[in-house]
Amino acid sequence: MCLTRYDEKFFDCRKSQIIAYLDSQQVPVIPLFYNSYQSTAEIYRQIFIENKSKWKYSEPSFSDDDLLRKGIRPVRASFPDFSQASDCLKDLLARHKLVFVWGDEYCLPYRKEAFQAIHSTHSLVVTGYDGENKAYYVEDWDGLYGYLPAVHLEAAFDSLSRQMRTLLVLELNDEEMRENKQEDTDLFRKWLQAFEDDYIFYDRVLLDMRDYEENRLISMDHGLRLIAASRHVFSKFLHYIDDAPEEVGLLIRNHQLANHIAAIVRRYIIAKQIDWDGAACKIRQLREQEDDFMRKLKSRYG
């Protein structure tokens, strides 16, 4: 098996790996995108106020309840340290299970930017064990499709806080794994009724961006890329429930415009040259298009 990324880098490492695995098993994942559209208010809160990077952004999709609803049962086992987890891990691998494991990037040589430099939690997919060479086969599109010496996996596992020292396996129940478009649509409508956005991300950026230092510009870039990826993922769900050509078209335009503005910001970070008036015009355009999209979506499905 060779997992490939599916989600345009919207979900965190663990969720994107789960999605890639389910897709590789022909499990329909798009129905689980019903709540993937993120408000700019939440993106602003996490990225600007909490100073998270886009890779640490937290969103509610792919909850255990949603997985169970689709016949996917998450099975977790916690351990005090890797020495007590290793027998369970080897047993799961011997039974051809794919295992999700958390690790500290500080201890992972293939994570070149973080190794021996940054302590950060990362998800690895472990699919095999070579007992002779004491190495685990890791599938991680962020740096490795190959064997990782057990000593590195052990160090990465044990470096985490106790609550993160877990192994995760997904048990798939073919009998319960059915498509129920009406149930998916009902959940989406319930989510949509509760959805609110005051578009503070755009308003604050328009007000302050000319004075941003580099770290704030990086936050702006991350926020815009989250907006773009969220719209891209959510467009797949809208296409699934109703084909909705007008709404999907609006989403794709917003996705493209957010990515375009993010590219302008990244060029400025590198070259220190930007047409601020032109950038502001595009941000106002995106805000208007986002508001127009949500009004039309609520009018159609609310």
Swiss-Prot record:
Entries under InterPro entries matching the protein: BtrH_N (IPR026935)
Pathway of action: Antibiotic biosynthesis; butirosin biosynthesis
Pfam family name, one: BtrH_N
UniProt-recorded name of the protein: Ribostamycin:4-(gamma-L-glutamylamino)-(S)-2-hydroxybutanoyl-[BtrI acyl-carrier protein] 4-(gamma-L-glutamylamino)-(S)-2-hydroxybutanoate transferase
Gene Ontology MF term list: aminoacyltransferase activity
Organism this protein belongs to: Niallia circulans (Bacillus circulans)
Reaction(s) catalysed (UniProt annotation): 4-(gamma-L-glutamylamino)-(2S)-2-hydroxybutanoyl-[BtrI ACP] + ribostamycin = gamma-L-glutamyl-butirosin B + holo-[BtrI ACP] + H(+)
Keyword Transferase found: yes
Function: Aminoglycoside acyltransferase that attaches the (S)-4-amino-2-hydroxybutyrate (AHBA) side chain from the acyl carrier protein BtrI to the aminoglycoside ribostamycin in the biosynthetic pathway of butirosin. The AHBA side chain protects the antibiotic from several common resistance mechanisms.
Keyword terms: Acyltransferase, Antibiotic biosynthesis, Transferase
Example GO BP: antibiotic biosynthetic process
Known EC number: 2.3.2.19
Principal EC category: transferase
